Curated annotation (Swiss-Prot):
Subunit and interaction comment: Homodimer.
Family note: Belongs to the RNase Z family.
Molecular-function annotations in GO: 3'-tRNA processing endoribonuclease activity; zinc ion binding
Active site: 67 (proton acceptor)
Full protein name: Ribonuclease Z
SUPFAM superfamilies referenced in this protein's UniProt entry, alphabetically: Metallo-hydrolase/oxidoreductase
Gene name in the database record: rnz
Residue stretches spanning the membrane: none
Length: 306
């Protein structure tokens, strides 16, 4: 799985429509499948997207309103049916442990997969396992809700022409990486002079929330900011009373965060044309898309910092 992309499996809030399923979002990245907020019917959406559910390795639940978690149980059962051998990590607010258990054990089946739970009871870095660093922050919603920032580590890349000019090859390259310098024939060579840093990419996933500082912090310089925009500005009063955002508010948060790309989602069923969200947000933040089911949003590797 060498691709780097977000695939939208659903983008409706609260209830599905004839054209939009409840939300579910899959990031395929660094040989992992990161599934966020699987709503009702997510398992079936994988079929329509022509993606094997077995790519999923980590599941994130922002909060336990039904449209963000009702697909959890069926996804775990499907992975069990498919006999996946890799662990399935599940991240969710610790305060919702009883709801997680109800979803996981809501029906009779023989569980054979290895599910590793990560109930989150604090903000900040909640896991760093080499491929990614996972950060969680509390959002401003009606119930305990987490937003997520996923960041890959920076990597050091050698500059081929400089390495060749110095005649370096083989195990000594690992010595240079480890020690930051090596001495050959009385001459000291420094890693910083023979390499560059490729900054690790970040993505942010913002589910239900009013605009708040946590949203900006999570989305700071993110390659993709996936953000709820339940309402348009004409219904801003509903957004405020239900603790959601409008498309304009989401765009304003993306601009403040310096995000590179904004993907809007979680559209209220009252709106038939999601294009309206994109048009509203573009007035503030040009590089924006209204999520479309089964569409892929790619984020190729960042160019190196030489």
């Amino acid at each position: 799985m060498s691709c780097r992309e977000l695939i939208v499996l659903g983008c409706s809030s609260q209830q599905p429509t004839r054209t939009r399923n409840q939300g579910a979002y899959l990031f395929r990245w660094n040989n992992e499948g990161l599934l966020f907020d699987p709503g009702e019917g997510t398992q079936r959406q994988f079929i329509f997207a022509n993606i094997a559910p077995t790519v999923v390795s980590r599941i994130f639940i922002s909060h336990f309103h039904g449209d963000h978690c009702l697909g959890l149980g069926s996804m775990l059962m499907r992975l069990n049916l498919d006999k996946v051998t890799h662990p399935i990590h599940c991240y969710y607010p610790a305060s919702g442990k009883k709801y997680f258990d109800r979803l996981r054990y809501g029906t009779i089946y023989h569980e054979t997969i290895h599910v590793i739970e990560h109930p989150i009871d604090r903000e900040g870095i909640v896991e760093d396992f080499g491929s990614f660093r996972i950060e969680a922050r509390r959002l401003d919603h009606l119930v305990d809700t987490l937003g997520w920032r996923i960041t890959e580590p920076d990597t050091i890349k050698f500059i081929p022409e400089k390495i060749k000019a110095c005649g370096l090859r083989g195990p000594i390259m690992q010595d240079l990486l480890r020690d930051k310098q090596i001495t050959i024939n009385g001459k000291t060579l420094y890693l910083k002079d023979l390499s560059y840093v490729r900054k690790g990419d970040s993505v942010a996933v913002i589910s239900d929330s009013l605009p708040c500082q946590s949203v900006i912090d999570l989305a700071r310089d993110a390659r993709i900011m996936l953000c709820e925009s339940t309402y348009l500005e004409e219904h801003r009063h509903l957004a405020k009373s239900h603790y959601h955002m409008t498309a304009k508010q989401a765009a304003t948060q993306a601009l403040a965060a310096g995000a590179q790309q904004l993907v809007l989602t979680h559209f209220s069923a009252r709106y038939l044309n999601s294009r309206e969200f994109e048009l509203e947000a573009k007035e503030i933040f040009p590089n924006v898309f209204a999520a479309e089911e089964f569409r892929s949003y790619s984020f190729p590797k960042n160019p190196p910092s030489k």
